[in-house]
Amino acid sequence: PLLAPFYGTWQVYKGIDGEHTHRNRWRYALDFHQVEKGRSYTQDGSRLSDYLCFGRPVLSPAFGTVIRLRDDLPDNQPGSIDLKNNWGNYIILQADSGVFVLLAHLMRGSIRVKRGDRVAPETIVAACGSSGRSPQPHLHMQVQQHASLGSSTLPLHLVSSLIQRGDTPIQFQLVASPSEGNSVRRAVEDHQLAAAVQLPIGRTLSYSVTGADGACHEEELRVDVSLLGQMRLLAENGAAAAFENQNATLAFYDRQGKSNELLDLWCLALGLTPLSSDAARWEDAPPAKLLPMSLMQRSVVAVARPLGAGIDSRYEREWVEAEGVWKQMGDHQLHIANRVLRARTVAILSPTAGCISLMLECCGKSMQADLTKYGQIADLGVPRWESAVDTENSNRANS
């Protein structure tokens, strides 16, 4: 998986299996350029400087090491190509995963790295150019088997991206394979939103949980780390879910242990949470066991889907200005045996207190969990502390 190798919004100029050059063993490649109002240039497009992407920073798409590069070829004037040096100026990186990544058609003299340099996804490595087989400025990216120039390509996809197809709303995609004409932007972490779901080791979250029968009880979740370094959110009865926070995304997985409605609600409502404030819509497929199903319903799922079933979950998020919180809403559908089990979740996220409220509606029943206090478990040199929460904001935002 690769991050988009640029700042801002670019468009896929040529996608996988694109005509002319993205064919046969070079089929898995993406070309990017910038477009405004359907044009990739200003003025009359006769000069390289007219093109929106020309000279823009090119970023490393992954952690890795610079293996090969070339930086001396001239940039073609618009409409011209260099067939002797197809790739133009280029950088080949070996990603930490072992594969090789080619960034091509770079601007002459713009490469900022040298062989052997370590790079990270935020490292500016060069500038977009028009060298090689490039009739207009653009950036070519491919994943390949070997370090040699022109090596066979491998399937590639982008992670944590904001994708727009035509006039449709922008959608966050954890894993994306954008097509020609799609607009692509790297999801950039919003620090306030990230703070709202920050889960450091030793954090405790105490909720007042109201079940479908109206009964209310207190329950605590806490954050711990396993012997192997896996971050986990733990319930009082030992139920647990692992999570990772990287590439501007909080993601929960590996739900283990006993049944726990509060932890399951948390994972259903917040299991995939992009930390970019520009991410207003996204989809996921969490496991069916997170839904509060009856024994009969679970039996039907087990028979119909013995290898496991995923929920069709669609999320939207908005900022509630009056309350100073984010409202993250999920619509969930499980299709089993010609029937559809529907559920709705709402999570209220405060920049200071975190997830202050969770709500679930499913099969005519409801569940509400309101944060009453949050704190930190004592550690050597770290004192224990707790802070109470005013739940009025969450109740108003939920209404």
Question: Where would I find each of the regions flagged by the language model?
Answer:
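Acidic, glycine-rich catalytic/binding loops that coordinate metals and/or anionic ligands
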Residues: 85, 142-261
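Non-catalytic extracellular/periplasmic "stalk"
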Residues: 1-37, 42, 340-342, 348-351, ...
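Short hydrophobic beta/alpha edge segments that flank linear recognition/processing sites
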Residues: 119-132
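Zn2+-dependent peptidoglycan hydrolase active-site motif and core
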Residues: 53, 61-107
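Short histidine-centered loop motifs in beta-beta connectors
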Residues: 99-122
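Generic structural motif
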Residues: 10-12, 56-68, 122
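N-terminal accessory interaction module
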Residues: 208-393
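Short glycine/proline-centered loop/turn elements that form peptide/ligand docking sites
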Residues: 112-114, 130-137
